[in-house]
Amino acid sequence: MAEMHPLLARARERARYSQDDVGAALGVSRAMVSYWEAGSRSPNDRQLASLARLYGVELSDLLEGRDAEPVGIDLTGMLLRADNAVGPESAPGLQEFVQFLERYAELSGLTKMPIRGMTQSPYVYRSKFSQKDDARRKAEEVRAHLGLGAGPISDTDTVCEMLGITIYRAPLGGDLRKAPSGAFLNHPSVGFSILVNLDMTPGRRRFTVAHEIAHALFHSSEERWVISHGRGPREDFADEFAGEFLMPSEGVRRFMEEVGMPPRITEDVDVIHIQRYFRVSFPTALVRLKQMNAITAATYHELRREVRPVALARSLGYRIDPEEYQQDAERWRIRRFPRAFLRMLRQAVVGEVMSPPSAAAFSGLSIADVVQILGQPLAGTDEPEGTEVEFAEYEDSGVVPRA
């Protein structure tokens, strides 16, 4: 048994867990994990089996002191144990998330295309020394780093790519009293990765992306994984960050002033214009304006109860996304994957590393989906191209000479 103790430390370090992580997973103190690794105490049989699963090694290797490579870290189990209040209906989505990350790492090796994932945050945040305006200042800091200023964010997926954060979407359950809105995981091979609950409304999903970015950038030094469920200081910070990141106070007030809105809003059309400008949902905009004291509590409840935001936005000339009326899971068959993964999958087929059927089996997509990723028209369809007409318009107007 004496030879096992140094092996415990090496297996933990290879799996990129801290002693705090292991203690939290097994329900023991960090000091106890340290005693195990130092050899002053020994884990019991149940704890040893849990350590083997956690580190992704065979139990027999630990018992016999063999320094074997991990065979598969139980990341799904870690996510499920991170919040005991999460219902069992969320387990398949969490497992799908972890399995996707493993396939992503495998595909990177097959295609020789690196995953440019962040593994350590450049941002400093110490929760023990938090101030009231920390979330606002941190959101401003990240926006400044990305060159976003105080204006709207057109695409949160692009923001994740710029930060080196992998984003994946999977169904976790629609009842947020039992289901998480999302999760963060610092994956051993992929790096910072976030999961968004696909069962939520489009507006809530967008908010969750910003919320999980907060966990990745500001809580990853303390936690390797976070399940976004329930309340607490960490969740409160991530919520405040998300609101400020999507609708910065400075940007909202500047927009209101530039278009001639009063400092205290009472009209439903003003909320619609703010919502559409910042590309968030009506509930997100209304909640954010209430947080900023730009509307009173009475106005908030009145607009929440009486406004039909999609119909009103349409009457004001705004383009309406079909999902604003009804969610459509079919639209997310391909879009649930990060773009970098889709680029790799396409390269695997183009480079003849995989055939279309094998790429479909590998990714869980249909062959028709893979054909679509390749940029080819689907069989039996005639997809009109408007690009030739547009090129002719540039040439006819003299913007560029004809070839």
Features from the language model and the residues they span:
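Short juxta-domain linker segments that transition from a proline/glycine-rich
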Residues: 1-403
